[in-house]
């Protein structure tokens, strides 16, 4: 009798742990979706300040020691490239978060199901 109770407690503890990890990775996945949909919203503040406006990019460029003197048009092209790269990087991070969530669920779901069935079987006995 005591052995079955111990096994049942073990099974429920594993289920609770799986649920906790699943909830954490669900949050990571939701944040990943937000990063994909609106990368400007989730990008780091210090990185966004560099590329948010052309003027801020130009000011940073001019402050850089040893920076090549470029025309406004050349600077604008570099600014657009840098902004696009920052946004693409944020979207890529979002895709990685989503992938991590899916991998976690692929691993956790069978563990949860096995232990949930074990706990139910032990409870019925």
Label each PLM-derived region with a short phrase.
Residues 1-4, 8, 12, 85, ...:
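Membrane-helix interfacial "entry" motifs
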Residues 12, 16-19, 23, 43, ...:
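Alpha-helical rod/repeat scaffolding segments in eukaryotic adaptors/tethers
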Residues 16-19, 54, 72, 109:
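Intrinsically disordered, low-complexity regions enriched in Ser/Pro/Gly/Gln/His and often acidic
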Residues 28-43, 115-125:
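Perimembrane helix-loop junctions in membrane proteins
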Residues 1-15, 103-125:
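Juxtamembrane interface at the cytosolic side of transmembrane helices
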Residues 18-28, 32, 104, 108-111:
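Helical transmembrane-bundle signal
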Residues 93-107:
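N-terminal membrane-entry
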Residues 32-95:
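Low-complexity, proline/glycine-enriched hydrophobic segments characteristic of transmembrane helices
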